[in-house]
């Protein structure tokens, strides 16, 4: 029904879903209601809805479609399905998520191992012990490192385990019992595994006591290096477990949601408590979300938890949810309890979630917010750029050149869409030629969504070059912006930045406090960080290839680097030092000494 023909008299007072569309019949927003007439009436009454984003939404709405359903549950499910189908701009829409990390022990193998997996990889058909989830990948891998140091279980794949004929380097480092070649009995291995399981369950007292005894024994035997290694392990255990202890929650499994809005941006923070331990926080960012707070929370909970293999017994929300059927829809057999506590430990956890959401907004953006209005007021753009790509490159005197682009969309940076381009060394002598190579390869295939804006680290020359390439490729609707430091122009010791764009092809400057300037600087810094990291990785691979010596395999190379720390030190080592490395044959040492002569000549 078109807006000019819209009449509340034609809308039923029934549960249902409504779709707001623009002049091109594109769905802008999808909402649900217990009473369609009352809900839609609030959009047309001056005092019906005080949210500042509603007038903005109504200006773009050309028609409204309604779908009547039988009850609230059907409305909730239909809304969720339609959001996934139409991807409306002003609704919460969670991207494909990698979910949390867990530690898993497969019980189907005769010699189980501990490994990190994503929660979406957990299936009921597998016999597994699951620990977690851990919101932070760092926390998960810290625990893996502790287990590797103190509980020498295998870490190899099942295929590698079956094919191995002799123990790997981890056995020499005392990080594996080498069950692959029968160096331990099943009882010995199971005893070590049981200790690891106790540790992961949080029962670290016995492990700590054992470690303290071993440290004391090593010290008494004057084995100070070994004692120091054990002490570092003990510190790592206490640090990893101490971060998670929260006695207030009495071993409960709880998720708490914090909601923070600032102008056109919304932050939703999810705090996870498992077995009474606060595991961390995850943040979700949405731009121009037009949903009411209760609707946003309901939509998020439904989208997020239906894809999770584990749902906590309790989900805390900052507001009581309108639809009591939500809990039932999530899990009909054992539905989670949804509540909004006003006092007690639950309220403290909700306050913590809110503070985390607010802090995340402050640390991920300039002081006020993203420069949505500045794109119109300063750059004179007719609409906000929803997809921005920022380009940069990195090389070392022309070698190992790498071009990249990063992607910024409504929800912030999207690393899954970042791309890397390896550049021929002939084209790295000219920075503009390198830029052209990257852009041509980027737009050679149009299977990836086109950007609304391209940002390049450079000045007027880079702006003209980028603009020319875009025009040559017949690409329309793409804004080009370049940003560069002004040469020989300092203000209070700081370089000024100059921005070039279609409105200001000769460039213009903004004060350092400008949100627009800070936004472009954030984009440029992220692209530069990504380019440098990929360049270093490429250079590292090249150095690795140089280190390859006939007869010196991966295991021997690791032993050499473990002893000498760098390949340069290997090339400077003596014959006596090489002979002390376990596993090196006389032939290996002769090959290394011959390579040392070539190395010293080139040096």
From Swiss-Prot:
Keywords: Cytoplasm, DNA damage, DNA excision, DNA repair, Excision nuclease, SOS response
Gene Ontology terms: cellular component: cytoplasm; excinuclease repair complex
Signal sequence range: none
Disulfide bonds: none
Domain GIY-YIG: start-end pairs: 13-92
An MF annotation (GO) of this entry: excinuclease ABC activity
Chief localisation class: cytoplasm
InterPro entries reported in the protein's UniProt record: GIY-YIG_endonuc, GIY-YIG_endonuc_sf, GIY-YIG_UvrC_Cho, RuvA_2-like, UVR_dom, UVR_dom_sf, UvrABC_protein_C, UvrC
Boundaries of every UVR domain copy: 205-240
GO biological process terms on file: nucleotide-excision repair; SOS response
Keyword match Cell membrane: no
One Pfam family, short name: UvrC_RNaseH_dom
Complex and partners: Interacts with UvrB in an incision complex.
UniProt function note: The UvrABC repair system catalyzes the recognition and processing of DNA lesions. UvrC both incises the 5' and 3' sides of the lesion. The N-terminal half is responsible for the 3' incision and the C-terminal half is responsible for the 5' incision.
Similarity-based family: Belongs to the UvrC family.
Protein name stated in the entry: UvrABC system protein C
Native source organism of the sequence: Chlamydia pneumoniae
Gene this protein is translated from: uvrC
């Amino acid at each position: 029904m078109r807006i000019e023909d819209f009449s509340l008299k034609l809308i039923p007072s029934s549960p249902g879903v409504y779709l707001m569309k623009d002049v091109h019949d594109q769905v802008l927003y999808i909402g649900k209601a217990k009473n369609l007439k009352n809900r839609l009436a609030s959009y047309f009454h001056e005092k019906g809805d005080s949210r500042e984003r509603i007038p903005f939404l109504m200006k773009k709405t050309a028609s409204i479609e309604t779908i009547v359903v039988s009850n609230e549950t059907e409305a909730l499910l239909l809304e969720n399905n339609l959001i996934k189908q139409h991807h409306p701009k002003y609704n919460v829409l969670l991207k494909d998520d990698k979910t949390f990390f867990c530690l898993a022990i497969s019980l189907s193998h005769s010699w189980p191992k501990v490994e990190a997996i994503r929660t979406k990889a957990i299936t009921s058909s597998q016999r597994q012990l699951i620990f977690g989830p851990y919101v932070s990948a760092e926390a998960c891998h810290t625990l893996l490192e502790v287990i590797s140091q103190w509980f020498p279980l295998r870490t190899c794949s099942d295929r590698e385990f079956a094919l191995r004929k002799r123990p790997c380097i981890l056995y020499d480092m005392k990080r594996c019992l080498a069950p692959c070649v029968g160096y331990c009995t099943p009882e010995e291995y199971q005893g070590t595994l049981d200790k690891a399981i106790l540790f992961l369950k949080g029962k670290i007292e016995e492990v700590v006591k054992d470690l303290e005894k071993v440290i004391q024994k090593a010290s008494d035997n004057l084995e100070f290096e070994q004692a120091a290694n054990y002490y570092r392990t003990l510190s790592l255990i206490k640090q990893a477990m101490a971060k998670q202890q929260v006695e207030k929650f009495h071993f409960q499994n709880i998720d708490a949601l914090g909601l923070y809005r600032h102008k056109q941006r919304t932050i939703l923070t999810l705090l996870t408590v498992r077995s009474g331990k606060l595991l961390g926080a995850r943040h979700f960012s949405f731009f121009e979300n037009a949903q009411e707070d209760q609707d946003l929370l309901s939509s998020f909970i439904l989208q997020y938890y239906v894809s999770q293999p584990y749902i906590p017994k309790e989900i805390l929300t900052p507001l009581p949810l309108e639809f009591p059927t939500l809990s039932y829809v999530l899990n009909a057999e054992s539905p989670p309890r949804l509540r909004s506590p006003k006092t007690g430990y639950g309220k403290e956890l909700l306050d913590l979630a809110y503070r985390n959401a607010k802090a995340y907004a402050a640390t991920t953006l300039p002081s006020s917010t993203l420069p949505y209005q500045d794109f119109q007021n300063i750059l004179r753009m007719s609409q906000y750029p929803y997809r921005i790509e920022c380009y940069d490159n990195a090389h070392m005197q022309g070698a190992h050149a790498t071009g990249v682009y990063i992607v910024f969309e409504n929800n912030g940076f999207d690393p899954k869409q970042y791309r890397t381009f390896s550049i021929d060394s002939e084209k790295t002598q000219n920075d503009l030629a390198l830029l052209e190579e990257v852009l041509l390869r980027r737009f050679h295939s149009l299977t990836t969504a086109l950007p609304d804006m391209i940002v390049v680290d450079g000045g007027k020359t880079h702006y003209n070059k980028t603009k020319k390439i875009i025009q040559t490729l017949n690409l329309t609707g793409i804004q080009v912006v370049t940003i560069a430091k002004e040469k020989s122009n300092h203000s209070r010791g700081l370089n000024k930045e100059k921005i070039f764009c279609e409105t200001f092809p000769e460039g213009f400057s903004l004060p350092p406090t400008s949100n627009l300037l800070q936004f472009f600087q954030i984009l440029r810094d992220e692209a530069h960080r990504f380019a440098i990291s990929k360049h270093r990785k490429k250079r590292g691979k090249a150095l690795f290839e140089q280190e390859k010596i006939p007869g010196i395999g991966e295991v021997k190379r690791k032993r050499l680097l473990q002893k000498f720390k760098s390949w340069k030190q290997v090339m400077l080592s003596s014959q006596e030092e090489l002979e002390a490395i376990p596993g090196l044959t006389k032939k290996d040492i002769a090959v290394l000494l011959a390579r040392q002569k070539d190395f010293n000549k080139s040096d």
